[in-house]
Amino acid sequence: GGAGWLATNNILGATGVAPNVAANTAPTDGTLRTLTEAMLKDVAQKCWEQGGDPTMLFVPGALRATVSAFTGAATKFDKTEDKTIYATVEVYVGDFGRYSIVNSRHQRARDVFLVDPGQFELLTLRAMKATPLAKTGDSENYMINTEWTLKSKQDAASGAIRDLQP
């Protein structure tokens, strides 16, 4: 998955090893530690220095409250007109960019990803094709088949903070 492509800008726990795409080596877990705002700033700077402009921060549910607790220069708002209190952070603005925070249930609970979506591209491996199947009564049946892959144009434009605990 995507975690295996983010090989350059990784912040890892002790004994953690980043993936190596060329050698087909998967990431190795390191010692768990607590996510801090300083870690986010560090990986954001690394991405920016490599020419990336990440705009999305993918966060697993277990770490969402930790991100919402980042203080930075934050101000919490209380909208009295509609009796709404905003107790979460939807956008994080840092020294190296503005990041939309995306809750993600499709990643490990110990990883956070800072992604530059402009550096990924959907490629077609096999074009969409309809193949007729056996006719059943008055209905005609088809199999629609296609094959895609996701291309990482520059893995250094994105980054990962790994080996995290809630």
Predicted features and spans:
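Sequence/fold signature of self-assembling virion shell proteins
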Residues: 1-46, 52-53, 65-166
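Acidic/histidine-rich, metal-coordinating catalytic segments
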Residues: 55-63
